[in-house]
Amino acid sequence: MCKIGARKRRILTGLPLSFLTFGLLAPLAGFGQAQDPGVRKATTDGAAPVPLHGLTTDEQTFFQDGLTRFQNVEVVSGGTNNGLGPRFNSNQCSSCHQQPFVGGSSPAANPLIAVASADGATNQVPWFEAPNGPVREARFRTSNGVPDGGVHDIFVITGRSDAGSCSIAQPVFTPAGNPVTGQGGNPNIIFRIPTPTMGAGLIEAIPDSAILAHQRASAGAKQGTGVGGHPNAIQGGNVNRSGNDGTITRFGWKAQNKSLLMFAGEAYNVEMGISNQLFPQERDETPGCQGYPTPNDYDNFSSSGAAVVSDIEAFADFMRMLAPPVPATPTASTQHGNALFVSIGCALCHTPTLTTGNAIASGSATLPSAALSHQQANLFSDLLVHHMGSRLADGITQGAAGPDEFRTAPLWGVGQRVFFLHDGRTSDIIMAILDHAGEGSEANQIVHNFQVLSAADQQDLINFLRSL
């Protein structure tokens, strides 16, 4: 089992690049050792989320309202937070986004174990939801191997005290594999874990022009490295969740969502089964399981202020105004690791800084927010999608992101993350680096550069990453 904290890994050095193509990445005995120091602790762990600096009083009100709703526990019927299901993955946003505090990523202790039987539900916990593993959503491929790309919710409301006579069955996810890594088992299923939302408003506020300008400016440095990358942008057609109006989408593992509002609307529907103005259709239309004929979530124009906006707008407001992660105080080791991060090529994709343009903070605002506009975002991402090869490929196409392509994951806050990569297969940041290499990956040369560093240099680079 993968455990949080120190765990030694042997890092091979001097490995010919051609070996990477065949996935021969197993650590070899007799070489220097670098070690993942584990999840970085901070005084803010478990504390209340911090908003962006410089918010106005009104913006702070919308942030706090969004935070409250982000933590609400949804129910099937009765009360004010109703509409859960009939198929769902969890019953509150914050259950999946709580490491190191609300708005973060998957926690060390999987909350879905308790959600399975909440309020009398009769769900079985799927094999890939381990008590000490990450929160995972499941996507089925079709029987002929062509992926459908859709999330298939792991739980149903059957048996709950607030579900009435609704009776539907869970999907069948067997045969089982490794419950912690999610590897092995049913080859027809791929997994995704939650992405952190800290600093998401700054990412949303980065204009397309800045992303494209950096792509052009870095083209020369990428020559000969195998690194390419392109925006997830599709020309033509009607605007949808993948933003095929030609603009650059940027949220999600494949940068499939353009805006935080779209990101929130899709998650509310897909993860909790709650219909809303952007996604009005139920996840399951079985008779007897339809509590409401209209979307559960909508704007309430009979109220005023923050109470007017729908839940998905409130979620978007919270994420938009949530401050970015705070890095640790630099040390000699992390400063040297930062320099190595650049020199071996990691920064070719994990761009340290991009700058925002004009941006509003809440759905009801009409003027740019000083807290979001023209700010430096130290996200460590170019917001492009890259070919990551056969080792990481999930076979899913979303927008212009193909079966083995993923968005460059922003690394701010990575030092406090427990699980890594799109499916949460490892809690060891060194293994996550090694898994960037494989047949067809743009990162092969960069991983090779890491592997030929001395053990001391490797350790400094790892320490730098854990300081973010």
Q: Where do the PLM segments sit?
A:
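Bacterial N-terminal signal peptides
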Residues: 14-27
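Enrichment for repetitive, rod-forming helical segments
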Residues: 10, 14-17, 148, 465
